[in-house]
Swiss-Prot record:
This is ADAMTS-like protein 4. One of its GO terms (biological process) is pigment cell development. Keywords: Apoptosis, Extracellular matrix, Glycoprotein, Repeat, Secreted, Signal. Glycans are attached at N454, N737. Residues 73-149, 163-308 are annotated as: Disordered. The gene is Adamtsl4. The keyword Repeat applies. Transmembrane segments: none annotated. Interacts with CTSB. Interacts with FBN1. It comes from Mus musculus. GO terms for molecular function: protease binding.
Amino acid sequence: MESWLGRLWLCMMLLLPLPQPCQDQELFGPSHQLPSEEGQVPEGLWGPWGRWASCSQPCGVGVQRRSRTCELHPALPLPPRPPRHPEAHRPRGQGSRPQTPRDPQSLYRPQPRGRGGPLRAPASQVGREETQEPQGAQRFRVRDPIKPGMFGYGRVPFALPLHRSRRHPHRPGQPKNSSTGEGMVPSQPPSTELASEKHGPHMQPPEPRSHSAETPRSGTAQTEVLPRTSSAPSYTGTPAPTSSFGDSRSFQGSLGPRMPPSPGSWSSPQGAERRHPPPFSPVPRSQQSRRHWRPPGPHRSPDGWLPLTRDSSPLWSIFAPSIPAPNCSGESEQMRACSQEPCPPEQPDPRALQCAAFDSQEFMGQLYQWEPFTEVQGSQRCELNCRPRGFRFYVRHTEKVQDGTLCQPGSLDICVAGRCLSPGCDGVLGSGRRPDGCGVCGGDGSTCRLVSGNLTDRGGPLGYQKILWIPAGASHLHISQLRPSSNYLALRGPGGRSIINGNWAVDPPGSYTAIGTVFQYNRPPREEGKGESLSAEGPTTQPVDVYMIFQEDNPGVFYQYVISSPPAVLESPSTKPPALQPQPEMLRGEPLLPSAPRPVRAPGTLQRQVRIPQVPPPTRVRTAMGSSAGYWKQVGHSECSASCGKGVWHPIFLCISRESGEELDEQSCAVGARPPASPEPCHGPPCPPYWEAGEWTSCSRSCGPGTQHRQLLCRQEFGGGGSSVPPERCGHLPRPNITQPCQLHLCGHWEISSPWSQCSVRCGRGQRSRQVRCVGSNGDEVDKQECASGPPPPPSREACDMGPCTTAWFYSDWSSKCSAECGTGIQRRAVVCLRSGETLQGDPEAGSTEQGCPLRSRPPDMRACSLGPCERTWRWFTGPWSECSSECGSGTQHRDIICVSKLGAEFNVTSPSNCSHLPRPPALQPCQGQACEDKWFSTLWSPCSRSCQGGMQTREVQCLSGNQTLSSRCPPHLRPSRKRPCNSQPCNQRPDDQCKDSSPHCPLVVQARLCVYPYYTTTCCRSCAHVLEQSQLEPA
């Protein structure tokens, strides 16, 4: 304890600059926080959503963010302000004593992050601090571990031998602002050792400017701190190289050396957001509720600490009590996709720009031109995977692509912070909200109600009759006639504006966009047996009226749609109803909770074992669209649109103050909560009668002139609507025509498209034809029915007379070749009987070719010819090829070859020597049979192992394929045996006297094991018998 007090006294004596030991003691000392009840975190209230930030990309798809803060409840008690140090009341400039320069200390004092905010020096010391950073601070900064990916290159994969800068990098000129780090290219691979002592002074980040009057502005230099995470190169335009200390964009706010968090950490358990401890300036309670918990600004401190305000003490408190951060359930940040304008067509997509930023980085000793590689799935879609052009591998350069990059080309999903997020129906990325069956965004379908029915009334007079009203917000609409009819469905929007089949005109089937949805109008042919229908997905933004244009009785109309009905509001019997009823524009507003009494405690004591009531600010009214000072109230309506009969008027809404009831500007009310000015019916005096004409009927003819008819009624509009009146009331008015000529299109006409053909006969009477077709008004051929109403078609066939027929013999020239090569032969020619040039051959009426022509005058059709006497010649005569010698595989074929002599038409076999002067044809040729199957092959049996009493013979068995190679595909059941018994006769026990060796070579016979052969058994009987006796004694 004495040692600790001694160090504290030393800190108070030195005053400025704050020594490092005291700084460590202050930052790492015990936390004196306001105890809470059993470690519970007080419940907080979400503040209003901030404005959407600007789009992250100047063109193309980007990301917008907005955030809100968790505010401490106004009823939360604050800790007492500790007394100021006595030195604080001493006049400025007094009490200061010169400081002895010490090696680990420096006149430059950064702004460390502590429990009480940044530590501030007296005003007398401001501006006298040096800009150079001492070695002690450098050594303190090196305590931060240098992680892979901190120097502008990807974290995974990361290997120093593979990723390094160019060996001879281009060094641009000195940048204008040295603090930004732009234009610097690392000359060597990043290492875990800072190069400040080797390469000169450090780059100092620029001091952030304060955007708040409560943030102190210091002119001191800032301690350089390595960034925590890697930052990819800039992806807009030319990639900006990064210095050896990482991206200069990481220096935002006043950064000091990293300190371990105190036991009372201000971060949430999930680490989703950081809590800001309140400053300890004695301010009024009303200001504390607004200043203690401020939304994070663009230049907030990195670890979530707020600087002291101007009215704070010039000295700092070592013991700064704190309050646990409030806890709010829900999200603190929202993101949505944005697009200011499309990017130019020549600009590459964002992934291509991000990959191209690594073209100047060496990979495995050489440079590549990188292009996006998108053939990945799952979480890899938001990684920067690039493939070098012309190579078949890819590399993950960074774990996260730039925010706003599409997960996949052509997809609506967007990458944010390395995650692929899908936009919900509310436009927020990752919200997961989808419209339910009745179009409610994020609804669960509990409020959906199906409305359906059949309209079977026969209907009224001819013309437009309203049959159905559909409210706004309806979805899944379907209206259809039960059977085909001459009636038509029509739609009118607010104010009687026509959507489909209005103004006495029938629209064609198709898609029609109105009131926030697309209506599909379908009119099937009558033969399908279905009536016309209207359908839409919805939801509709305004109500719509459904009309029927009656021309006959109503065949029945089926309708159905889904509407969202609001849930019933349950009121407590003890709660008094408010004097001002909520207006429709207050959509799902949060009800005001009754204020709870604030606990009373004795002055100077801590408030323990008391829960903070969840009471919203009493002066704030929350609605679904945010906070607003007024509400929309209907104060009247416009003039009636019709001076007589039935019309419509529109309600008028004004913005009324919730407190005073006075009229406010429209900006004081939520624009999205303004009720729609839906038209309402109004009535005037009866209108003058008028003629109402019905729809014209179809034309009486499908083409050409026809007639149309229509019905004519005298109608008059009254307050309750229009009705038919006697025609006499319209007698003073000109009567419209009830008939009119019509012509859908011109009828077709007959056209001769080809001349007459030749007569079918060459003499006598025959037929000829021509092409006749029906041509429309545009010159194209149409169906013959189009010409049926016109004159009859011209004839397409007629008879023709070619004169009387005569018969005569006609013959051709003699053939050019004689039938014999030598000697006498024959020449032939054709002779036919024709009648006026037409042959009678094959004509059943003419009979044979000689009929009609005199046979005695028939010219001859053959004659003799001779090419000279014949000479004997010799030639080889070949017979047919024989069958292939092999059934399978390769084989041979042969044929017979003989020498033949020829004299005219006589052939004789002669000696082959007579044909020796001629090339002899081959008698053999190779042939290929069918594909050979694998077969078993075996060798000859070996000699018997014994001459008597049973021996064994063996042989080799192999499976060979068709090309005589070893195979294993032979049938196992057909495999021949490899062994068989032999010499089963008994042997003589002893050799008799007659068993003698008659050859001097018997010892060699025994050694050669030739006793198994009968010859040697007889010649060398005794020697072979001795061998037999020894073999019997040995085991088999």
